[in-house]
């Protein structure tokens, strides 16, 4: 957990404590957010490319949208 930024650790603690809701389809959630980042023209091309690459790698992995 120490390798993640403070904001991620904070959200993790909030989910674990029940203050924030847990999303069972975590991969679907990640893919949705990565898609939003990749299509956000207000962000740098570098960030958008990183998001697109990460999403594509998830899609190539064992992820199956049921």
UniProtKB/Swiss-Prot annotation:
Pfam families: UPF0253. InterPro entries: UPF0253 (IPR009624). NCBIfam families: PRK04964.1 (NF003436). Belongs to the UPF0253 family. This is UPF0253 protein Ent638_0728.
